């Protein structure tokens, strides 16, 4: 499971699961084991906005902090994502 960064953001690792690269760019956030159980899932748009698809065990404050971090670093994160997947940014529902 590739991590976007080696450090935690608001107490959570930001990563994606290599089997999920068939989807558009997204970010999982998990504090312990890097599994989907209990993790949040954010789909990332080309303008740096995110759609929260699953909140997991994160509280609202942590969700907002992570969304802000993604907004500030989405280009760098996309560079890593695109090494694994040809699928681009999220285009909405």
Locate predicted features:
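Short, charged/polar N-terminal "headpieces" of proteins
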Residues: 1-25
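Alpha-helical protein-protein interaction elements
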Residues: 4-7, 18, 34, 66, ...
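Short non-domain terminal segments
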Residues: 5, 14, 40-41, 67
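Short linear motifs in intrinsically disordered/low-complexity regions
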Residues: 7, 50, 87-88
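A short, structured beta-strand/loop element
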Residues: 18-60
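Acidic, low-complexity intrinsically disordered segments
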Residues: 54-93
């Amino acid at each position: 499971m590739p991590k976007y960064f080696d450090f935690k953001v608001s107490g959570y690792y930001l990563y994606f699961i290599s089997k999920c690269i068939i989807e558009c760019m997204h970010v999982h956030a998990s504090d312990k084991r890097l599994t989907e159980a209990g993790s949040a899932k954010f789909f990332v748009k080309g303008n740096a906005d995110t759609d929260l698809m699953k909140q997991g065990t994160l509280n609202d404050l942590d969700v907002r902090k992570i969304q802000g971090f993604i907004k500030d670093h989405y280009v760098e994160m996309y560079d890593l994502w695109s090494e694994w997947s040809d699928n681009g940014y999220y285009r909405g529902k």
